[in-house]
């Protein structure tokens, strides 16, 4: 599949094993005859594995270089990556094919496309690659702590550890992008034109100096920068439930789309006259993501292939056909990108939760006769599978 010779493949396997050992990662690739086998430790996370494989990948290095240097000259970047300009050109052409799903491209050594999409792409990428150590290092920075405290003050609520991590990643990306001249804010400003007078947005805007590590926002960019930040908060489960209710209570495009989705679900008798607050919250996040962004980086090839694998163990009714009818009536949910698959998967998770919202407790027995190591492995596999659904809690 890779097109590598066995000698080249062996060289890469040795390189990856050496790098894993140097970084203290419990990971080994075994090459046995014609078979490759991956062994990982119980503490090894998926993002650690992805980081190991991506670190020396040319396309990934191009993306990282662009974030921290804003632009490049082809001959200089080729020298830095120790490749020819022709090879760099081939990688850029291939990378642009991937980026087209996000309405983005790299042209003449610069990003081309809406600014909120550039930051969203980096957020999707780094969220799957950043190590725990990287996240913790950024969490300890005074400017990040101040940003968390400021947002908690505005919301009147504490953020969870996961919300803090996502906020830290987004603000780090935004801080790097502040150095870029002539960012394209027109698309996000047009999408969110109904929210410039929103009371929560105005409150957030007044606190602008407390974000972006205290950097001064260039003249004429403050509205665009703050609207991109506001859009991220609206769409990535950062804001608490009561804050989202407050924002959506003033109307706007997102509230309209949410109302349409709820109406379509009522037609299918999935919702009654009263919708639980946390269900409305989850639906609002799905609406915000499809309205504001395009594209997604799937976690793995098979997770979202619903035609090959049903996402749940307990679901009595298959709602995929119902989902197709509902989303067909709402053009915003039909991007033709991998984001569609992610949104469908999360919507089905929510429907299963609603169908099983009695808080059903189950005891799962595991065979202990094979010893502790086998038991631990079985428990880890079971936990990974079930935790694909955020509405299942494992105690």
State each model region's role.
Residues 1-395:
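A cross-family "folded-core" feature that marks the main globular domain of proteins
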